[in-house]
Amino acid sequence: MEIKAEEISEIIRKQIKEYGTEVAVAETGTIISIGDGIARIHGLDKAMAGELLEFPGGITGMVLNLEEDNVGAAILGEFSEIKEGDSVKLTGKIVEVPVGPALIGRVVDAIGNPIDGLGPINTDTFGKVEVKAPGIVKRKSVHQPMQTGLKAIDSMVPIGRGQRELIIGDRQTGKTAVAIDTIINQKGGDVVCIYVAIGQKRSTVAQVVSKLKEHGAMDYTIVVAATASEPAPLQFIAPYTGVTMGEFFRDSGKHALIIYDDLSKQAVAYRQLSLLLRRPPGREAYPGDVFYLHSRLLERACKVSDDCGAGSLTALPVIETQAGDVSAYIPTNVISITDGQIYLESDLFYSGVRPAINVGLSVSRVGGSAQVKAMKQVAGTLRLALAQYREMAAFAQFGSDLDKATQMQLARGARLVEILKQPQYRPIPNEKQVLIIFAANNGFVDDYPIGSLGRYETELYAFFDSRKATLLGELRDKKAIDDAMKGEIIASLEEFKKEFTA
């Protein structure tokens, strides 16, 4: 066999040409201790706060503490396989999650990986989990209504697009029910909903998802789940993942609604992380920056100015209280950050008033300017009437001989309370809410026993749907009641009164 010099030189020339001169440089460190989802890493001198780290087995982490000789990081995932001595790589990136319309209808974990068994999410768009909230110039005051479909809220504690309205109450008082009803009520509208479940049982999350599917609400909803069995770092980061997904729609000029269920559990997860990172504890053993934990999250929900696309992100954070104590650390923090609160009371809940909203303690600081004019016209005196009724009812327990005016006020108040009750998963359109509240305020239900008012309401809606559809449509479109329409409504209610038998 003859070896030709030209062939050899050709092969060498070809090899030299194909030789890649790129050298991949990655800064790596070594794990010196690990446990409870926290790793301490030596040798990552160039790490940035919040930077994404790569652990063995494709697991990621996030830099939280930058100390003199080591870095404290939270592991975003299962850490049982990671051990001391393993090497960790810096990625040079801040933690990012997938965003965009491809996520709608999906259930994802705290870092955006699908967990619903429907295959991968096809999106090339990613958003940084930690970004600064929009500045003052980019914002606009809240002026469009965000309908919840719940009579008690839309009439007395109205919510606007871009508002942050806290839902607060003890366990088992219907906080999640209010949030889920609000999502269901957005059906057929232009709002994308994001439900973030933090520290809940998996069975509960599965139940919520199946209810949303049953009512066709998953068609415009994203569910982010960091359940009770997930490590604390994932429960801490889940709300930020959710708000990043919501910001995509807000910044595209669309409208989004995000529900954090609930932020008490996120605060507990963050307390766990902070104590393990040896940060000094403060009140109730929470770290000093637990206020900033929630304020930087909730400030990202806002109404954007017309120059920036006029989109909005509305937030409904949920906080669980212990035995009705709203003066605890986390509840007071979140009350001071949000634009109002819906306070749910267990006593009302158990006495059959559902949604169990305490009208005296619930308030919407900015929603009034966003309320539909027709609702403002009929529900203006509702809050005062109910507050007076509660006071009067408490006083009337001690005296039996009440004058006629007091008896009438008590009877009207009891009927108003009854009219504002509503079954779960049955949101009511705004124009129908206006009708029933108008009827109650103008004495059309005073002659009927309280027990028959549920039937009165159902039959009233059916009557207007079938025989007064034009009036209903007019009320829906005009969103205000003029004198002519008021006359028509009264005439229609009189007509219905003749037909309805208690």
Swiss-Prot record:
The gene coding this protein: atpA
Residues annotated for ATP binding in this entry: G169, D170, R171, Q172, T173, G174, K175, T176
Assembly and binders: F-type ATPases have 2 components, CF(1) - the catalytic core - and CF(0) - the membrane proton channel. CF(1) has five subunits: alpha(3), beta(3), gamma(1), delta(1), epsilon(1). CF(0) has three main subunits: a(1), b(2) and c(9-12). The alpha and beta chains form an alternating ring which encloses part of the gamma chain. CF(1) is attached to CF(0) by a central stalk formed by the gamma and epsilon chains, while a peripheral stalk is formed by the delta and b chains.
Family: Belongs to the ATPase alpha/beta chains family.
UniProt-recorded name of the protein: ATP synthase subunit alpha
Main subcellular localisation: membrane
Pfam families documented for this protein: ATP-synt_ab (PF00006), ATP-synt_ab_C (PF00306), ATP-synt_ab_N (PF02874)
PANTHER family: ATP SYNTHASE SUBUNIT ALPHA, MITOCHONDRIAL
One cellular component (GO) term of this entry: proton-transporting ATP synthase complex
Keywords of this entry: ATP synthesis, ATP-binding, Cell inner membrane, Cell membrane, CF(1), Hydrogen ion transport, Ion transport, Membrane, Nucleotide-binding, Translocase, Transport
Matches recorded under SUPFAM superfamilies: C-terminal domain of alpha and beta subunits of F1 ATP synthase, N-terminal domain of alpha and beta subunits of F1 ATP synthase, P-loop containing nucleoside triphosphate hydrolases
Subcellular localization, as worded in the UniProt entry: Cell inner membrane
Record bears the keyword Acyltransferase: no
Membrane topology: Peripheral membrane protein
Enzyme superclass (EC): translocase
CDD domains: ATP-synt_F1_alpha_C, ATP-synt_F1_alpha_N, F1-ATPase_alpha_CD
